[in-house]
Amino acid sequence: MPHFIIHCSDDILQSMPQSEFNQHVYSVAAHSGLFVSGDIKVRVQAFSTYLVGEQQQSFIHVFASIMQGRTVEQRAALSRAVVTKLTSLFPDTPNIAMNVDEFEKATYCNKAMLG
């Protein structure tokens, strides 16, 4: 963790390769100073059928899932930094947003913790 799961309209990946898109979000997260670089996970899921309001408009939405312990200000700065970067890369995309959700350390488990 943390996980950055990006949902976007499929036209986004027609203008930039997925690997490059992932790298941009990864770089912003790594430079935030909030995470160990090797722990950051980024992935994209593109959609061909969707509605934004009542129409099919291009969109990018980043869902960040991070372990508890960061301040509201840190989480807000992370969102702002990612949205700022994506806005610079996709200036014609009308809908770009991000939210940050926290999960409890006490309930988190991964394979390495089992043994």
Residue ranges and their predicted role:
Residues 2-115:
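A domain-level signal for the structural core that forms small-molecule/cofactor-binding pockets
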